[in-house]
Amino acid sequence: MSINSFDNYPMSWKPDLSRASGPKYLALVSLMEDDIKNGTLKAGTKLPPQRELADYLNVNLSTISRAFKLCGQKGLLSASVGNGTYVCADVSAETILLCGRENPRLIEMGALVPQVSGNRLVKSYTERLLKRPDALNLFSYDDPEGTGLQREAGVAWFQKSGFSTHKDHVLLAAGGQNALTAALGALLERGDKLGTDPLTYPGVKTAAKLLGIHLIPIQNHDYEMTEEGIRYAVQNEKIKGIYVIPDYHNPTSHIMSLKTRKMIAALAREKHILVIEDGINNLLTENPLPPIASFAPEQVIYLSSLSKTIAAGLRTAFVHVPDQYHRCLATTLYSMNISISPLLAAVSAGLIADGTADEIIRGRKEELRRRNHIISQSLKGFALDCPPTSPMRYLRLPDYFTGKSFEICAKQAGV
């Protein structure tokens, strides 16, 4: 029995293990999952200190530690040195944003899906490609790392972002998420820690959860990682690297300053940490800033997918890989994919080589300007965050709305 009385002691969570069977740490994990689902434990709740909870439950501290560690691996908890342990802010959020078409009358705004106006150009090029005498080869296996011409196309694609590399440092992946998951799996081990922005892309969370990698929120100022925050995480959290989206960050839509890009590159070199830079939206910005990779190419894995800029179904991404990571990442991509689709890779490379990709990107940017003008006019008088050229805009809700009530009203209105 616990030495201390907790009858009138305020605790954010008082689980009941009296009916638990089997290992107590697993029972505690199960109770936490249930309490999160039923709303007893809400997102953002700070949990009691582990020693305090162990005393309350009359169990060994190691039981609580094992339970919290497993909950962290499941994506339920987030902990940092000196700040305690919290229920993850997005623990109840839907991780799969793409939906089917069961309700065609519902306007889908959950996932960031590019407009389809450029698809006719992709279709036209694909039709010409399939009429070539060697078109049957596009349905066979191909070079797992991409052909020389495809990797040269990757070099040309990166140059559009102001980043110069060599084809020997370019790998191909089956889209940005595939590239990101491969990079995490190849270069980090289960239990390793990766620094991210406090608000970050849901896809890195699902990949990290799959691989048992812990995401550590880095201190931000004006939506950008601070030097102090990165140094603290390296020293105290022992992070192995950081993940960043410098351009039209998902979900904040912030564009990282040139000063911060250079600071991250300098710290990566000084501390010998990995930087995974997601450049998926770089070419949609009006005046693209140089990627972090351009300042520290030997420390940065630079991912650039064609999904948001050319076509969502063109599952191709180019990956800049420094020498020190090349063999490991190439092997992981092979293990995951065997080979990327020769057809999609050939279409992607061809669109870049003949200038069609540039035409589609110009159309995308013009469409974004038109859409942003519409939303600015339609919601005049309301506070709209994010740049007026962004693929995402944020509406600051009036006081009479909560996020949940707005979501319900929007769904009733068909959104």
Predicted segment positions?
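N-terminal basic, amphipathic alpha-helical segments
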Residues: 1-130, 139, 150, 330, ...
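Short Gly/Ser/Thr- and Asp/Glu-enriched loop/turn motifs at secondary-structure junctions
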Residues: 82, 166-167, 386-392
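PLP-dependent aminotransferase class I/II
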Residues: 301-378, 384-387
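Short hydrophobic/aromatic beta-strand micro-patches
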Residues: 320, 394-396
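Hydrophobic residues in beta-strands of the RecA-like P-loop NTPase core, especially within AAA+ ATPase
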Residues: 196, 276-277
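Conserved core of the PLP fold type I
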Residues: 138-271, 282-301
